[in-house]
Amino acid sequence: MEFDVVVVGAGPAGSVAAWAAAEAGCDVLILERKAEIGVPKQCAEGISAHGLEHAGIEPQDEWIATEISRALIYAPNGKEFEVPGDGYVLERRVFDKWLVVRAVEAGAEVELLAHARRALLDEGRVVGVEYEGEDGVHEVRARIVIAADGIESRIGRTAGLVPSLKPVEMCTCAQYEMVGVDVEEDATHFFVDAEFFPGGYFWIFPKGEGRANVGLGIRGSESEPGDALKVLNRALEDHELISEAVADAVPVEVNVGGVPVCGPVERTYGDGILLVGDAARQVNPLTGGGLHTSLVCGRIAGEVAAEAIEEDDTSASFLKRYQDRWEEEFGKTFKYALKASKIFSEMSNEELNALAEALDREDILRLVKGEEVVKVAKKVISRKPSLLKYAKHLMK
């Protein structure tokens, strides 16, 4: 078999890449290791309205669980900040399939239960994929391979583009979908506590009628395998605000996984290959959110792949335009978020509470967006001189 483009992974990044490439006239094959696309879900399912708009995707009632108008952020001492912002909590099992259907309607083919083993190389150039299907091991040739195969990316590793993750470079995550959760359902809820959730935070994302995704991420360097679920259960019992919200709630689904928080890999392209989504570690290191970036970077990857096929040039020098384009969209955001993530992960509860006392909601919004950071840092220094060392790092 031979295709113009083989996409490994049918998550949002891979599906949008396949959709864009197929829409541009490429012969596209999607290889997906799961039996069912979108199952199990691997995230809290939230995305901003801007994120969908940026990706060129119109909201559809069939995959929107609830609409969001704000975020509520809680400091360790319980102080609450309201940050306005429109968004959605999705039904990812519906959304992910919807994206694949768009790719198929554009002409892409899909093979499920296809476990990618390695990239096929010819003198350093990626020329296809070896995968294990239901009836044995196969090789499929491609002019371009788009690796969207997740955080461990076998394709990216065998192509020499994806290094191993260190514990400090990832967060381990655990989440329940629960029914009977008592929170305001027009808001997403974020709880920061260095003692409960070291190097991370806790979230409640409402899905309507008392349903919600309730979970956390904690820094891998601050935990052992399996700790995330233990910490989640402890928070449900012992954290004052969280335990109150879930007092009558019952879990109906559990999900565990990992999120890279180290910023993107150095090179997301090579001869005959592009990396997208978690495979490229295109995840915001501060929030751990990757859906918005995956959708936009996936579309860029599909478009650049189609341009390369059209120009008959799949060299790294041509495909570099993919990285140039996504860096133009997200480069500054990733750089700031990585710096801010490192700072916040080092702060104690006493320091986090002091920061909360120094800031108002507009300041919090600026910090989250990475806007007017120097102005906010100067305000922190004037109000809480004890936080000077952190504020100075933000100003660099």
Swiss-Prot record:
A Pfam family it matches: FAD_oxidored
Gene3D superfamilies: D-Amino Acid Oxidase, subunit A, domain 2, FAD/NAD(P)-binding domain
EC number: 1.3.-.-
Gene Ontology cellular-component annotations: membrane
Single GO term (MF): geranylgeranyl reductase activity
Catalysed transformations (reactions): a 2,3-bis-O-phytanyl-sn-glycerol 1-phospholipid + 8 A = a 2,3-bis-O-(geranylgeranyl)-sn-glycerol 1-phospholipid + 8 AH2; 2,3-bis-O-(phytanyl)-sn-glycerol 1-phosphate + 8 A = 2,3-bis-O-(geranylgeranyl)-sn-glycerol 1-phosphate + 8 AH2; CDP-2,3-bis-O-(geranylgeranyl)-sn-glycerol + 8 AH2 = CDP-2,3-bis-O-(phytanyl)-sn-glycerol + 8 A; archaetidylserine + 8 AH2 = 2,3-bis-O-phytanyl-sn-glycero-3-phospho-L-serine + 8 A
InterPro entries cross-referenced by the UniProt entry: DGGGPL_reductase (IPR023590), FAD/NAD-bd_sf (IPR036188), Geranylgeranyl_Rdtase_fam (IPR011777), Geranylgeranyl_reductase (IPR050407), GGR_cat (IPR054715)
Co-factor binding comment: Binds 1 FAD per subunit.
Keywords: FAD, Flavoprotein, Lipid biosynthesis, Lipid metabolism, Oxidoreductase, Phospholipid biosynthesis, Phospholipid metabolism
One annotated GO biological process: glycerophospholipid biosynthetic process
Cofactor(s) listed: FAD
The protein's annotated pathway: Membrane lipid metabolism; glycerophospholipid metabolism
Enzyme class: oxidoreductase
Record: residues binding FAD: A13, E32, C43, A44, G46, R92, A116, D278, G290, L291
Other noteworthy facts: Reduction reaction proceeds via syn addition of hydrogen for double bonds.
PANTHER family on file: DIGERANYLGERANYLGLYCEROPHOSPHOLIPID REDUCTASE, GERANYLGERANYL DIPHOSPHATE REDUCTASE
Functional summary from the UniProt entry: Is involved in the reduction of 2,3-digeranylgeranylglycerophospholipids (unsaturated archaeols) into 2,3-diphytanylglycerophospholipids (saturated archaeols) in the biosynthesis of archaeal membrane lipids. Catalyzes the formation of archaetidic acid (2,3-di-O-phytanyl-sn-glyceryl phosphate) from 2,3-di-O-geranylgeranylglyceryl phosphate (DGGGP) via the hydrogenation of each double bond of the isoprenoid chains.
Family assignment from sequence similarity: Belongs to the geranylgeranyl reductase family. DGGGPL reductase subfamily.
Protein name: Digeranylgeranylglycerophospholipid reductase 2
